[in-house]
UniProtKB/Swiss-Prot annotation:
InterPro entries hit by this protein: Znf_C2H2-type (IPR050758), Znf_C2H2_sf (IPR036236), Znf_C2H2_type (IPR013087)
Protein name: Zinc finger protein 80
GO terms classed as biological process: regulation of transcription by RNA polymerase II
Single GO cellular component term: nucleus
Organism name: Macaca mulatta (Rhesus macaque)
Amino acid sequence: MQKGPLSLATVSHTETFWRKVGPKRDGLGTGDGLHSWVLQEPVSTGDNPRECDSQGTSKDTLVREGKTYKCKECGKVFNKNSLLVRHHQIHAGVKTYECQECGKAFHEKVDFVRHMRIHSGEKPCKCVECGKVFNRRSHLLCYHQIHTGEKPYECSECGKTFSYHSVFIQHRMTHTGEKLFGCKECGKTFYYNSSLTRHMKIHTGEKPYKCGECGKTFTYHSVFFRHSMTHTAGKPYECKECGKGFYYSYSLTRHTRSHTGEKPYECLEHRKAFGYHSAFAQQSKIHSGGKNL
C-alpha cells in the first residue's frame, strides 16, 4: 500500500504521527501479516519546542536511518514517537485503563486485558500435553517445563538445578545472604522488590484474586492458583506407596516421610529429629523461652 509523507514537526513539541494497525491476534497465534496505517491525533509531548528535520520523510525511512526519540527523564530511546508518548505517561503517573471491578489502573491496554482475565476467569492458553489452561501465555510456558523436565540453570555453589531463571537467581542470593529490599512497616527484608511488593499486601489487606467457583479471595496469585485446583476433579499428586492423593506437591512430600521415616529437622539442643518443620519449630520455641523464631 502506498503511504504518503509523514510530518513529525509542529510547534511546541506537539507531534503528529502515524500508527500501524493490523488484524486482531489471539493470545498464542500470529497475525496474517496484513497491516494498514492510520493518522493519530496530535499529542503534546512536553513544553520544550524543537525543530525536526524529518518533515516529509516516510516512517520506513526514519527507521532505516536510525531516527530515535529519547526520554529526557530516564534516557530510554524509541524508534517511534508514539512509543515515546506512551512511555511519558509512566513518568507522569497516567494510567488510562481502569478496572471497573476492583479499581486497579494500568498504563498499557495489554496489561489491563490480562488483569481482566482474573475477574472473568478466561483462560485462553492451553497446554497441548495435558489440556490444562492458563490466563497468561507466560504461565503456560513456565508450566510446560513440568512435562519437559528441563532445568537449564545450575548453581555453581551447590549444583542444584532450576527450570526458571528467576528462581535460580533467587537461590543464588541464599548463598550470599544479600537482601536488598526492606519493608517499612515491619522491617522484613527480601531478595527481590517483587517479593516486597507481594509482602506489602499483608499490611494493606489487598486480595485481588477471587475464585469464580466459591467466591473466596486471595492475596497472592500462587495461593489462588493452588486453591482453584481443589475445585477440579482429582488430585494430581499421588503417593506410590499407599495411593493417597494430594492437591499440592509439598503435601505429597510431607506425606512420603511417613513411609520413609525421614526426619530432616534436627534440634541441636538435644539432638532430637522431626519429620515436619511445624513440630521442629514448636520444639525450638520451647528452648527459646516461648519466642517465635
